[in-house]
Amino acid sequence: MCAGAQFLHRDSEDMTRNLTTAALIGLVALGAACGKTETPTTPSPNGTNTNIYYTAIGASDGIGFGGSSPCLPFSDCPTGTGYVQTLRRRLAEGGRTVDHLNLSIPGSVLSKAVFDLAASVGRPIDSLAGNFIDREAPFVSTATTHLTIFAGGNDANTIAFAARSRGGDVNAFVDAQVRQWGIDLEDLVARIRTRAPNARIVALNLPNLAASPYLAGNPTVEKSLMQRVAVGLSDRVNALTTRNVLIVDLMCEPRIYLPANYASDGFHPSDGGYAVFTELTLPALRDGTNRVPSTSCAQRAVFP
């Protein structure tokens, strides 16, 4: 079976191993730093304090993989072309001081539930990558004033592959996995709030991966399955509005689906794709702009 016909987390094994090894070293350093007493000022993104502490939670997207200048995990990477790196530069416009912590780990998934699911169907996620709840949330700085979350890409591939592998009622299986994922996402947000209670949290929902180039050659039945997963996960992100989280609507943005905005693997964004991510995220992250995500756009139902 060709690679495009499989539902996998799309980071190559060699790339994931190398980058997650670097991430593990970084986590050890972060753990040592977090062991020290922190005495930050209270985060107040809506106040007059011009200082910003921007934390990013994500997977390979957070290091700009697929772009022309990807970063090593936890590196400063001031010239990176990913959305996290560009957002940092945009936040600094006007002379504001911006501290930054990028916790993104390539190959990572949201929670242990997805991590265990991948192992159960013979597609284990690298143990160094782990999951956001265990490997990223504990290291959110208490000084954080602004934070982004982008979760679901690797998770969607894992859930869709597991559904196809297990057979039976695939829709019921997917819906159960999506419900658990939503519970775990709320847990992630709660853990972040414990670490940084006043931080402005912005979550990017998931595009309809069924319409992405990496699945272009797959049968319609598999695309429909992925659509069910991606729309379901995206809706769980959208539900975070009830928890005072601002949502960026990638699902319903037509430019997200332009071939030029994908890297050569058809899964990760290109520089152009990351530029769209940045454009859509900046108003919410910098200004607190709240735009209600659509529940009826055409991109939610590309396939039957």
Can you annotate each of these PLM segments?
Residues 2-4, 8-32:
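Sec-dependent bacterial lipoprotein signal peptides
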Residues 31-52, 289-304:
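Bacterial Sec-dependent N-terminal signal peptides
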Residues 53-58, 62-64, 99-104, 145-150, ...:
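Structural recognition of the beta-strand scaffold that forms the well-ordered cores
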